[in-house]
Amino acid sequence: MKRSVPLEKAAEVVCDQSAIPPLIFQLPPEQGREVLERAQDTPVYLYPVDICAQKINTGKWGMIPVYFVTPTCHEPVRNVIFYIHGAGWVFGSFHTHEKLVRELAARTHCLVVFPEYSRSPEAKYPTAIEQCYFILAHLWQITNKQYPQLNHHTLTVAGDSVGGNMAIAMALMAKRRGGPCIQKELLYYPVTNNCFNTPSYQRFACDYYLYRAGMQWFWEQYMPFEAGNPITATPLQANMKALKGMPKTMIINGQADVLRSEGEAFGEKLRWAGVDVTAIQVQGTIHDFVMLNALDQTNACRTAMDASTAWINRENQ
């Protein structure tokens, strides 16, 4: 298929494979989850790390598994990345994001805390962000026994796609609720709005892996109609007062992604609010390019991982 943007070969293959009907968002949620889980069985290099998991009660929001990932070394970790996974609020798990989380932990020498929040449509907004915020707000109590040496002043919230959306929500909720103190946020191609007629939505509406119709379906699964457009779901609609004082932010977007316009617009709006922003657009790639095992060795993924881990390491010094 001839596309208007030249992609790396591996990204072309992913686009072609994902275009075979039925599309993942046309399946019942459980079947779609299985499709992504199987796709992420693709062999890939996994950085050596130590992983432990526990179920944590988030009060009225229920029990969720939380994974704690540390680099395999003798030196104690001092910094934390609180990572929220993407995949449309409907799909995704620790397995689908394991290679990404392992690399972040190993290359930044951080403890990565990974909540496996309740997914939609079974759990609607704001369940997932409330679960994540509960873990974040109680992070130091939860980790103190096993990791007493953690630095409370270098906390990073991070996420990809809708996980980036929820990472932004964590920063907004922490501002509104008085903590915890978040130093920085790392956002890979984040969802920041529910507007489907942006330039990137129009240009990449289909045939580029993430379809406009797919994003519309994801939003329908996640947001109750009566919820409206709260800024913890649509942060691009936040005013300057709400965005002022947000953490230092890195935003990495892919060129051929329906979400690119809103990700870039959010970075610009943060700058207008006085926030320290580093923004990168990676050419020749598609949505999910840092998450998908099949794209791990592409120039796009390696560039994004080099840039983001270097940024975290620099800011943690």
Language model segments and positions:
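A glycine/proline-hinged amphipathic helix-loop "lid/cap" segment
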Residues: 1-71, 228, 299, 317
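Proline/glycine-enriched tight loop/beta-turn segments at coil->beta junctions
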Residues: 62-64, 71-80, 243-246
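Active-site glycine-rich loops that stabilize anionic/oxyanionic intermediates
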Residues: 85-90, 256
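Short amphipathic alpha-helix adjacent to the substrate-entry channel of hydrolases
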Residues: 95-114
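Alpha/beta-hydrolase active-site loop
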Residues: 123-146
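Gly/Ser-rich "nucleophile elbow"/oxyanion-hole loop immediately N-terminal to the catalytic nucleophile
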Residues: 141-157
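Alpha/beta hydrolase fold serine-hydrolase catalytic domain that processes acyl esters and thioesters
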Residues: 152-154, 168-317
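Gly/Ala-rich beta-loop-alpha elbow adjacent to hydrolase catalytic centers
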Residues: 159, 163, 167
